Amino acid sequence: GMTFSDGTAESTVTFEMAKVLREELLSRGYNVLMIRDDSDVQLDNIARTVIANNNSNAHIALHWDSTESDKGAFYMGVPDVSSYRSMEPVASNWQKHEALGKALIQGLSANGVKIFGSGRMEMDLTQTSYSTIPSIDIELGDKKSDYSKEKLKILSKGIADGIDSYFGF
C-alpha cells in the first residue's frame, strides 16, 4: 500500500475506515466479516477472495490511490475485453461487480464525496477475476485526501447507502 502525504500508512487508514464502515453497516442490520482485524495482515489477494467467496454476500476492498491530486473516489471496473469477460468465474459475475461499483459511487456522490471522472477505472484484479460474489475494489481518494474521522464517517455513510441500494434496501 501507499503512504499518505503526512507519512501515515494506507493500511492504517483503510483499517480505520473499515472499522467505521463496520459500525455503520451493523447499525443498519448487516452482518460484517472483516477480512483483517489488524492494521496490517499478510494475506494475499487470492486468500482474501477465497475467504470472501465462502463467507459473504459481497466483498468490498477499501483503498486510497497512490496519486497526489486529491482526485476523488472511483472503483476498479472489470476490463471491457471479451476474452476476459467470457472466462469463468468472471463471465458469471462481472455484471454484479459493475453494479456494486456503480451503486457505491452513487452512494458516495449523493453524500457529497468528490468522484474521479466517471467513477470507474478499468483494472484486471485478482479480486474480480476469482470472485463468485459481487466484489469491488473502491478507491476513496488518494495520498492527498482528507481521512479525518469526520471524513471517514461521510465515506462510510456513502458506501453503506450504496450497499443498501445494491441489495434493494
Segments from the language model and where they lie:
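Active-site-proximal helix/loop segments of hydrolytic enzymes
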Residues: 8-169
